[in-house]
Amino acid sequence: MGKKSGSSSSWLTAVKRAFRSPTKKEHNNNAHGNEVDEDEDKKKEKRRWLFRKSTNHDSPVKTSGVGKDAPAQKSTETTTIINPTVLSSVTEQRYDASTPPATVSAASETHPPSTTKELPNLTRRTYTAREDYAAVVIQTGFRGYLARRALRALKGLVKLQALVRGHNVRKQAKMTLRCMQALVRVQSRVLDQRKRLSHDGSRKSAFSDTQSVLESRYLQEISDRRSMSREGSSIAEDWDDRPHTIEEVKAMLQQRRDNALRRESNNSISQAFSHQVRRTRGSYSTGDEYEEERPKWLDRWMASKPWDKRASTDQRVPPVYKTVEIDTSQPYLTRGNSRTGASPSRSQRPSSPSRTSHHYQQHNFSSATPSPAKSRPIQIRSASPRIQRDDRSAYNYTSNTPSLRSNYSFTARSGYSVCTTTTTATNAALPNYMAITESAKARIRSQSAPRQRPSTPEKERISSARKRLSFPVPPLPQQMDGQSLRSPSFKSIGGSQLGALEQQSNYSSCCTESLGGGGEISPASTSDYRRWLR
């Protein structure tokens, strides 16, 4: 047993020496020229050592001290033999573990020991600082390359994400801004429409308030009547149909009282508002509205005064306008058979402002026409509102109005009368607008000598003026009542025409032609009328 254990240990040591001794010699001889081969040998040695270490642990036999010394000597002796065949022996020992160690030990015993001083150098580590530095540099470079590649990939990924996210963010921001802009536009349009509607409503409300108030009042009255009828019919019906408690009856009565009070308050408010609207409209009215109110006041005043058809009633009313009557004589008329009759037909007007009198004085004239059967001195009247009351005697003249029968008076419905101002009187007290014009003088001359008048251009001018100045006057309904005119009767006028004049005469001419060829009376010209009216 002891021999076997010694032989096994010697075989192991011999293998170690055979594997390490030539590498050390080569290292010393080549001066570190074959470092790569040495590294490979070291790797192989490590692998073999690990393999043999496991086998050594499996063997339970231990060598003694003597056995250790002997295999050491034998290994030194056999180095020369095993040196050329190191690799082959290593491979054989590595893959063929069944070879007996006796042959190796015998070979080692036959050769003497040569190198015993190289044993400590076999266990020395051959790693140097240069190799460590080279490994660190290689690892650092490789790791830096990997880090740079990862960083480059990360940067590209971040850029791609930023690009995509930025595009999405910009798109979302644009969409948000567009939505906000559309919302602002809609709000502005709605606001403008509301302003326009409120302005139009406020402008139209001023014109439609009165109508709406009236309509509301009318509808309110209708609803009140219906509610009253319903209440009158429903009290008994409800009371008869189903029983009510005292609280319900009180509540019903209180509700009806509240509704009645509410209706009264609404009516009072609507009335006050309508009065206010009328008051404001009245403040904006002009003089035309004042002119429209005056006929109403005149109608009321005229209706309050009873008028008589006789002259005595006319004389009791103080005249506002003075009447100037001038007699003109014609050679073919006689005074003996004429009857003297005063024609006090004057315009009865209330004492009103000068504006009112001036507005209506152009429609008030007195008519006096001669009779074609018995021509009498012609009665000419001229009314002027500017003549004072105390000068009445200076301008009051009486004339004889011809008539076939007794004088009679008829009431004319229209408030117009004919005014003629053709006179031959040379009164110095007459104003300028009462002066006789050339056309009036020519007309008087033509009437004085009807048989001897030549055919001159004046005749044509007179006839044209006669046609021009015979114009119809529109009626005034406000002034139709209370006017009494005295006019001579005509044989040629029918009863129907007189009846029409008694009821309502819509027209009155400034000049009336006689049917029998008598004298004709007409105003001088329209300019004289205008000056007279002013």
From Swiss-Prot:
Region annotated Calmodulin-binding, chain positions: 157-173
Keywords for this protein: Calmodulin-binding, Cell membrane, Cytoplasm, Cytoskeleton, Membrane, Repeat
UniProt region (Disordered), positions on chain: 1-123, 259-290, 308-406, 441-495, 512-534
Gene Ontology CC terms, in alphabetical order: cytoplasm; cytoskeleton; plasma membrane
Cell compartment(s), UniProt: Cytoplasm, Cytoskeleton; Cell membrane
Disulfide bond residue pairs: none
GO molecular function ontology, one term from the record: calmodulin binding
Residue ranges, compositional bias (Low complexity): 97-108, 343-355
Main location: cytoplasm
Chain intervals with Polar residues compositional bias: 1-12, 73-92, 111-123, 326-342, 362-372, 395-406, 445-455, 480-490
Alphabetized InterPro entries for the sequence: DUF4005, IQ_motif_EF-hand-BS
Domain IQ: from-to ranges: 131-159, 160-182
Described function: May be involved in cooperative interactions with calmodulins or calmodulin-like proteins. Recruits calmodulin proteins to microtubules, thus being a potential scaffold in cellular signaling and trafficking. May associate with nucleic acids and regulate gene expression at the transcriptional or post-transcriptional level.
Stated family: Belongs to the IQD family.
Assembly behavior: Binds to multiple calmodulin (CaM) in the presence of Ca(2+) and CaM-like proteins.
Full protein name: Protein IQ-DOMAIN 17
